[in-house]
Amino acid sequence: SDIRFEQNDGRSTLKFLLVHGSPRSVNEYLLEDHDREDFVQLLLENDAHVMAFGHSHKPFDKVIDASRNAKLNDYRHVFNTGSVGKPKDGDVRACYVMLNVIPNPNPKLSHRYMVMPEFVRLDYDVEKAAKAVEASVLPDEFADMLRKAY
């Protein structure tokens, strides 16, 4: 399942798509080195200018120059939101994204806005969370995953 919304100022519409894994599958991993052309295709097929996803729990953002594709004439944005509860990027802190939409200074592009995700990191008591996992029915290796952020 996905969430879609738009920002419209009367002159242009910015279309957002939020998914867990990808628009194709909740279990698909979209990693930072994912093929650029496939990102463009996903955005085009889903009529989105901005796509946010998770699943891999590895935060990144990527601006895609879609003007090289004949069907698009602007830049698109994809980003992985990271993870609040189970980071896998080596940083044990919780990670979430604040999405900033600002006026676009380039009048040649079709959209009047730029999207700038801000990754926010928060400290929390990782050891307390890991011990709670160990005291539960969950496998102890999950506690180690929290401690090591993998």
Where are the predicted features?
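Short beta-strand scaffold segments in enzyme catalytic cores
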Residues: 1-5, 58-63, 95-99
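Active-site flanking residues adjacent to catalytic metal/cofactor-binding acidic residues
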Residues: 19, 54, 81
